[in-house]
């Protein structure tokens, strides 16, 4: 489930045939880049396992780490060197794909404002963060394998679940500022309106911020990100420049639904279950294939590619299920936004704007939706909003226009 209100799909009547063809080509090429990137990673990991190159990579890591000293420190250093080498190899192989999908296509289709130098800086930051997380996570994982050869998968599953929660909470204060300009929302009337909306929902927020997307993209976006004391409202400058307050409010009401209805926690729980299942399968695969693969034992770092293949297989197989659950959650969030604001016209106009501005694909096929779409197609969302009636608005009265946070007359509940 996406935590951002990403509207990548458009209503039927939004596009001329020319724009429809353009959007279809754009999304087809983006999907192809995603598939090629995935295939590269799979081929790399499988090749390392079946060719025996992973054993050679481990020997190289051991030779580099040998001067560290005592065995326990040397083992940890070997893990770090191995992960570093594997990450660099993967990055080198995937760099052309990332450049094509993340820079070339965005500029070719008129969606990017970003200079090449800025894009490369962001890539370097992403690589550094990914390397840090990979090294820390793998070091923890192999420490647990060494500590308990039988139950490491269960303990690791719990540890990584805690890591997901921590990263979700820290994203708005540590990660987002590394890539985007964030400043307090200056438009007082809109800020008051959005804070009132959050208060009615019982979602404590630390403030409302302008999210500087225009340095990088022409796309619009909004989010309610973080947990607890780090939760904050984000509205992109690209959205502030083009959308009415009513449209922004209904977009944010959709985001609020994910927090009020516990969708964020549901998503993290689902991810944690997938990780646990992946680790369990990896443990069984390592038990069976460690010897035939030439590994010393299940704690041999040379088995990392095999572990990643087994664990990743679970997530890959479950992609259609994850997307189906996400689409159901997004439909529920749309209904919540309509109930809370009582403004289907603003919802429809916001969807249409997002569809055009973000170069949405008009009508993706069922198989494409099944494999790639975490949100319902936008024409479906618009039809649902157009069918919205007073009788379907439930027990959530809309906020009085202009009400200050302490004047809101209704508190949003989780609903049915």
What is each model feature region?
Residues 3-7:
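Short linear segments in intrinsically disordered or otherwise low-structure-confidence regions
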Residues 11-298, 317-416:
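Polar-ligand-bearing catalytic/cofactor-coordination segments
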Residues 299-308:
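Loop-to-helix entry region at the N-terminal start of transmembrane alpha-helices
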């Amino acid at each position: 489930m996406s935590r951002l209100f990403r509207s990548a799909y458009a209503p039927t009547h939004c596009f001329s045939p020319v724009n429809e063809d353009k959007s279809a080509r754009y999304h087809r090429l983006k999907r192809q880049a995603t598939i090629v990137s995935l295939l590269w990673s799979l081929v790399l990991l499988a090749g390392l396992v079946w060719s025996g190159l992973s054993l050679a990579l481990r020997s190289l890591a051991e030779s580099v780490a040998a001067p560290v000293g005592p065995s326990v420190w040397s083992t940890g250093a070997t893990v770090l060197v191995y992960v570093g080498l594997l990450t660099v190899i993967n990055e080198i192989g995937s760099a052309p794909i990332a450049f094509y999908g993340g820079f070339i296509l965005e500029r070719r289709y008129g969606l990017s404002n970003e200079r090449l130098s800025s894009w490369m800086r962001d890539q370097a930051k992403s690589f550094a963060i990914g390397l840090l997380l990979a090294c820390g996570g793998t070091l923890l994982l192999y420490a647990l394998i060494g500590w308990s050869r039988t139950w490491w998968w269960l303990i690791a599953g719990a540890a990584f679940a805690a890591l997901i929660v921590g990263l979700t909470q820290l994203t708005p204060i540590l990660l987002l500022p590394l890539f985007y300009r964030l400043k307090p929302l200056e438009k007082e009337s809109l800020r008051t309106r959005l804070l009132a909306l959050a208060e009615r929902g019982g979602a404590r927020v630390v403030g409302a911020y302008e999210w500087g997307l225009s340095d990088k993209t022409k796309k619009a976006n909004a989010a309610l990100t973080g947990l607890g004391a780090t939760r904050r409202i984000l509205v992109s400058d690209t959205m502030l420049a083009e959308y009415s307050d009513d449209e922004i409010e209904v977009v944010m009401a959709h985001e609020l639904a994910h927090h009020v209805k516990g969708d964020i926690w549901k998503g993290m729980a689902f991810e944690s279950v997938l990780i646990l299942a992946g680790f369990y399968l990896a443990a069984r695969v390592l038990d069976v294939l460690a010897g035939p693969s030439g590994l010393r034992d299940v704690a041999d770092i040379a088995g990392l590619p095999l572990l990643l293949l087994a664990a990743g297989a679970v997530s890959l197989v479950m992609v259609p299920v994850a997307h189906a659950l996400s689409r159901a959650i997004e439909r529920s969030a749309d209904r919540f936004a309509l109930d809370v604001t009582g403004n289907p016209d603003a919802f429809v106009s916001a969807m249409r704007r997002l569809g055009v501005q973000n170069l949405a694909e008009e009508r993706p096929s069922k198989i494409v939706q099944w494999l790639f779409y975490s949100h319902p197609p936008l024409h479906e969302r618009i039809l649902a909003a157009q069918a919205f009636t007073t009788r379907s608005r439930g027990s959530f009265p809309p906020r009085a226009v202009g009400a200050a946070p302490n004047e809101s007359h209704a508190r949003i509940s989780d609903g049915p």
